[in-house]
């Protein structure tokens, strides 16, 4: 991965674009890889849900600055549009992080809602939603007990505070925010309808075997994911 990123940076330098380009590195979600005795990714523990984001823009953004605010993947499009001085997307909840980073703005006077959500909704499992608000994080699994963590004091998420009465206030506040505009039963019904539509299309594809010139067919030796 480092080599391929290096090729992109070399191409920018070769074309004299390296000093006038905003570079954003962002990954997909993580994997549990045994943390909390779990594998794969369908949880909201930090190893699964948290992703790195690195921005580099010579002359515009300071080197080595680290944000302590809570940001979301939704903020990426708003940040790129802000960098282009383009209008924000309509109905987008994304927020540009440039006011928090640029020395000329230095974050002064920026009103930043220190909150982010993540969801996992399918037709074959309970609907999940997570909220991160400041140092607090609540994992909501519909029909199951919630989990509450203070990431400042417990970054490894080993001490579930949802069972402690001292934290009932913050727990109820976060549960209310989770349910604001989010109905797990309605979402489950929507996902079942989508699955029915998918099954029709999948059946058609199996029976007709349409030519797909855009499909990337892996060689047997490359298809290692399920081995």
Which residue ranges define each predicted feature?
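Long, internal low-complexity/basic segments
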Residues: 163-227
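Histidine-centered active-site microenvironments of extracellular/periplasmic hydrolases
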Residues: 10-62, 69-72
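Active-site beta-strand termini and strand-to-loop segments that position acidic
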Residues: 57, 131-134, 141, 151
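Non-transmembrane alpha-helical segments in soluble domains
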Residues: 2-9, 13, 77-81, 85, ...
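Beta-strand elements within well-structured catalytic alpha/beta cores of enzymes
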Residues: 1, 5, 22-27, 53-55, ...
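Short, solvent-exposed loop/turn segments at the edges of secondary structure
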Residues: 46-50, 92, 126, 133, ...
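Polar, surface-exposed loop/tail segments
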Residues: 19-21, 63-129, 167, 172-176, ...
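Short catalytic/ligand-binding loop motif for oxyanion handling, primarily in non-cytosolic enzymes
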Residues: 31-35, 41-42, 62, 100, ...
